[in-house]
Amino acid sequence: MADSLELVIDTIMAREVLDSRGNPTVEAEVLLEGGAIGRSIVPSGASTGAHEAHELRDGGKRYLGKGVLKAVNHIEENIAPALCGLSSLDQATVDSVMKQLDDTDNKSNLGANSILAVSMATARAAANGLGLPLYRYLGGPMSSLLPVPLMNVINGGEHAANNLDFQEFMLVPHGAESFREALRMGAEVFHTLKDLLSQKGLSTAVGDEGGFAPNLESNKAAGDLLMQAIEQAGFKPGEQVSLALDVASTEFYEEGQYCYGGNSYSSEQMVEELAGLVNSFPIVSIEDGLAEDDWDGWSLLTKKLGKSVQLVGDDLFVTNTLRLQRGIDENIANSILIKVNQIGSLTETLEAIELASRSSYTTVISHRSGETEDTTIADLSVATKSGQIKTGSLSRSERVAKYNQLLRIEDELGSQATYAGLVGLGPRGSLKG
């Protein structure tokens, strides 16, 4: 067991590195007195909610304005002096000090990217100092639930240069006995889908999250393709592998109307469109089915589908306890997407997860479209017993890195490991029983 002095923060460094889109992002390193090091890199999103914490960029010509040297500077000149000498074990204090230093509601002074990088690196340094895996350090000895992956195998919207309006069409291999088997099932459907696309003369180029990005005549056509791929891979749709959608509807919401596919829909009509898809396909989860500030529309959607489908708020809640509490109070949605960089610190992320859990909302731990080799979210999904993770398709190493980390965790847990399966999917899981 490490001496408490060995776990005191000694040095904090930062640098500008690249994410999976070739854009700069922030990496932080926290060195403890005893020699343990924690390193973390923050992700960034393409379809970002208006209520997310502020990601600080440099502007100007360098990296087309997307440099992060200001954020790196803030870490080394403002954050490091304030944190050195504190215990890495006191995550809440570390994050609170940074929040006070920033002194804005959305972290626009220091930047959520600088605060989060240090926050996550501190947790990893503490875990390394104690000789514990990160999931065990964050979650304790009872953390043994492996999440169901929501695998984004067809990309559209802001994640791909194609004509699909909905952003993600996902596989959900809930019928597996283990995470390892779930990953295999997803990979087999992914490769079958690639063959199907090739046979139809469609593009097999991949989007930001590693899924295919073909031009298709409609969102329904994407669902039909996935059903065909699941069956041809030898699995039963709805029993072993189901579907999930990220509509990302804020991206095509204009003046109170949802405009896509050459048509405009009111909130009521959009709800009926989604209900029609649920009737046509084994859809277990819909994310951002309505826009981030269309609270009345969300209420209609929840009344229509909330007892049969997981309704996930991403742009709606932005990992923010204030917005989540409003959703809970108004019975809106039944699940929250958890993105660490939406709120900008590990402590606030854990608070959002705790509030959701207390209120019987499911949680889905999620990557961003601009990702890195950092695997923190894999450990976080196990630590928090979330039961679900979104980390892209079965290609691109920044996506696969998280899957591989979950394989390692499952191996390490051995007979203690439990795969969440259908139970992890909230209302749909309880109905299927």
Curated annotation (Swiss-Prot):
Q: What is its EC number?
A: 4.2.1.11
What residues does Mg(2+) bind to? D246, E287, D314
The UniProt note on the cofactor reads as follows:
Binds a second Mg(2+) ion via substrate during catalysis.
Give yes or no: UniProt keyword Metal-binding. yes
- Any Pfam family hit: Enolase_N
Swiss-Prot/TrEMBL cofactor(s): Mg(2+)
Q: Where does (2R)-2-phosphoglycerate bind?
A: Q167, K339, R368, S369, K390
Q: Name one GO biological process term.
A: glycolytic process
Q: In which pathway does it act?
A: Carbohydrate degradation; glycolysis; pyruvate from D-glyceraldehyde 3-phosphate: step 4/5
Q: For this protein, what reaction is catalysed? A: (2R)-2-phosphoglycerate = phosphoenolpyruvate + H2O
Kindly list the places in or outside the cell where this protein is found, as annotated in its UniProt entry: Cytoplasm; Secreted; Cell surface
PROSITE patterns, per database record: ENOLASE (PS00164)
Which Gene Ontology CC terms are recorded?
cell surface; extracellular region; phosphopyruvate hydratase complex
List, from the UniProt record, the residues annotated as the active site of this protein. Answer: E209 (proton donor), K339 (proton acceptor)
> What GO molecular-function term can you cite, just one?
magnesium ion binding
Q: Which UniProt keywords apply?
A: Cytoplasm, Glycolysis, Lyase, Magnesium, Metal-binding, Secreted
Primary localization class, coarse: cytoplasm
Q: What does this protein do?
A: Catalyzes the reversible conversion of 2-phosphoglycerate (2-PG) into phosphoenolpyruvate (PEP). It is essential for the degradation of carbohydrates via glycolysis.
Family label: Belongs to the enolase family.
Family annotation (NCBIfam families): eno
Return the protein name. Answer: Enolase
Q: What lineage does the source organism belong to? A: Bacteria, Bacillati, Cyanobacteriota, Cyanophyceae, Synechococcales
